[in-house]
């Protein structure tokens, strides 16, 4: 099945359509991704490889894709993926950039073991950093990227220009949407029936879908719409990336840590944490002390779902655009949506499952009102589930009954933007045997 959908994915360039993507009044980074000039001509049968690093806020992941061109002159098909990851993410090495680059070097060894030596020199390697590095001061982020470039330069793989960069948030959303809808067969022929995508990272979150109503297009803020053509059809996507609204960034906002200048010696407390808890947490290279509300403290000292939800609600309420159309739409959700659902047995960790938005609220109530029982694995479980509930309902405006397909993989291929980015990479380089 993966091969079949992989073939469908690569049919994207078969039509060789001009696909300039633009915001309402300007061209943007996506211009030329699927241009006809990228269609390979007279290629011979071969096996192709592509290496894509996803440098997220909580970890660095490597995706090694194998593509096979079985018949000369035909576009290659996706045959398989190797996936590995390391923690923490590059942003945790904000003051030790060389050490951060060493984590990338460690994953490159996986690529060496996976890609035949004879293919190393023509296998491209690229790293795209996401919200974790976007949140860092520019000079700090560039120091990390420089060290990664040095690692790549010494590697035996093909290193394209701009091989190490920070990716625009909307780039994540669009490529994830394309990946999911191609792997599920939603974009075949002239069908406009697609699924939306929700990605919840550590530092940012993305929402992308194809609006079905003119009212949505008319009421959408400037910069949230992106148009492109494929299969002789025009798709105008609603897509936006919210920096600072990822799961772990939201923890800091909920705790009030983002509003505190001096954090040394300060313990941040929350109704979302058990009373007995006193701990520390490192995010983005910064150490935070945190704990539960204490009885008798200033304030209510309450714990449980209701006071917790009031805290996370302040993080999202009135800060995200709410397109009415999403209330009746279906979405694929992945990353931390998937992880927290799996952590609480709402879905199977390997196969995923289907949930309604209200299922997250029900589980959040269960966890938060029984904090002593549910915090052995993660003391933030109550806060995370409550935040996800608030993000979906009060942030994006989803209805309780909205259906979410929780998926880590589609047809055995990881969801997310990495496959789409690798596809673009191979085509833009015109790589063939």
Swiss-Prot record:
Broad class of enzyme this protein falls into: hydrolase
Function in brief: Hydrolyzes nucleoside diphosphates with a preference for GDP, IDP and UDP compared to ADP and CDP. In the lumen of the endoplasmic reticulum, hydrolyzes UDP that acts as an end-product feedback inhibitor of the UDP-Glc:glycoprotein glucosyltransferases. UMP can be transported back by an UDP-sugar antiporter to the cytosol where it is consumed to regenerate UDP-glucose. Therefore, it positively regulates protein reglucosylation by clearing UDP from the ER lumen and by promoting the regeneration of UDP-glucose.
PANTHER family: ADENOSINE/GUANOSINE DIPHOSPHATASE, NUCLEOSIDE DIPHOSPHATE PHOSPHATASE ENTPD5
Record's subcellular location: Endoplasmic reticulum; Secreted
Enzyme Commission number(s) from the entry: 3.6.1.6
Similarity-based family: Belongs to the GDA1/CD39 NTPase family.
Disulfide cysteine pairs (residue numbers): 272-308, 368-382
Segment forming the signal sequence: 1-24
Top-level taxon: Eukaryota
Active site: 172
Pfam families to which the protein is assigned, alphabetical: GDA1_CD39
Cofactor(s) recorded in Swiss-Prot or TrEMBL: Ca(2+); Mg(2+)
Post-translational modification: N-glycosylated; high-mannose type.
Biological processes annotated in GO: 'de novo' post-translational protein folding; protein N-linked glycosylation; UDP catabolic process; UDP-alpha-D-glucose metabolic process
Subunit structure: Monomer; active form. Homodimer; disulfide-linked. Homodimers are enzymatically inactive.
Protein name per UniProt: Ectonucleoside triphosphate diphosphohydrolase 5
InterPro entries for the chain: GDA1_CD39_NTPase
Glycan-bearing residues: 232
Gene3D superfamilies per record: 3.30.420.40, Exopolyphosphatase. Domain 2 (3.30.420.150)
Associated pathway: Protein modification; protein glycosylation
A GO MF term: CDP phosphatase activity
Record's keyword terms, sorted: Calcium, Disulfide bond, Endoplasmic reticulum, Glycoprotein, Hydrolase, Magnesium, Secreted, Signal
């Amino acid at each position: 099945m993966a091969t079949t959908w992989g073939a469908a994915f690569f049919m994207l360039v078969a039509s060789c359509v001009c696909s300039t993507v633009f915001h309402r009044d300007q061209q943007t980074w996506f211009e030329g991704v699927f241009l006809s000039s990228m269609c390979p001509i007279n290629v011979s049968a071969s096996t192709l490889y592509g290496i894509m690093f996803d440098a997220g806020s909580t970890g660095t992941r490597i995706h090694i894709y194998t593509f096979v061109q079985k018949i000369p002159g035909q576009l290659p098909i996706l045959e398989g993926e190797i996936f590995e990851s390391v923690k923490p993410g590059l942003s945790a090495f904000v003051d030790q950039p060389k050490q951060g680059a060493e984590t990338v070097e460690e994953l490159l060894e996986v690529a060496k073991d996976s890609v035949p030596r004879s293919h190393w020199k023509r296998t491209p390697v690229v790293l795209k950093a996401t919200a974790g590095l976007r949140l860092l001061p520019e000079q700090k982020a560039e120091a990390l990227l420089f060290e990664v470039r040095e690692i790549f330069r010494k590697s035996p793989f093909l290193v394209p220009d701009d091989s190490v960069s920070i990716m625009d948030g909307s780039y994540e959303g669009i490529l994830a949407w394309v990946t999911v809808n191609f792997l599920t067969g939603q974009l075949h022929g002239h069908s406009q029936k697609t699924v939306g995508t929700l990605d919840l990272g550590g530092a940012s979150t993305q929402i992308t879908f194809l609006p079905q109503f003119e009212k949505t297009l008319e009421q959408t803020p400037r910069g949230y719409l992106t148009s492109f053509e494929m299969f002789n059809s025009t798709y105008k996507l609603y897509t936006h990336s919210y920096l600072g609204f990822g799961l772990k960034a939201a923890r800091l906002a909920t705790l009030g840590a983002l509003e505190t200048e001096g954090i040394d010696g300060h313990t941040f407390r929350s109704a979302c944490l058990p009373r007995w808890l006193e701990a520390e947490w490192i995010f983005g290279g910064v150490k935070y002390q945190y704990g539960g509300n204490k009885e008798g403290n200033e304030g209510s000292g309450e714990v449980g779902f209701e006071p917790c939800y009031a805290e996370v609600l302040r993080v999202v309420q009135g800060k995200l655009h709410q397109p009415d159309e999403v209330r009746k739409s279906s979405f694929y959700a992945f990353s931390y949506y998937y992880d927290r659902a799996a952590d609480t047995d709402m879905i199977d960790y390997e196969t995923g499952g289907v949930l309604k938005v209200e299922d997250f609220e029900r589980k959040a109530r269960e966890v938060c009102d029984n904090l002593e029982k549910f915090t052995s694995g993660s003391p933030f479980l109550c806060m995370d589930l409550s935040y996800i509930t608030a993000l979906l309902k009060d942030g994006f405006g989803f209805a309780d009954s909205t259906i979410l397909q929780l998926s880590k993989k589609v047809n055995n291929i990881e969801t997310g933007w990495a496959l789409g980015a690798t596809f673009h990479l191979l085509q833009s380089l015109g790589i063939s045997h």
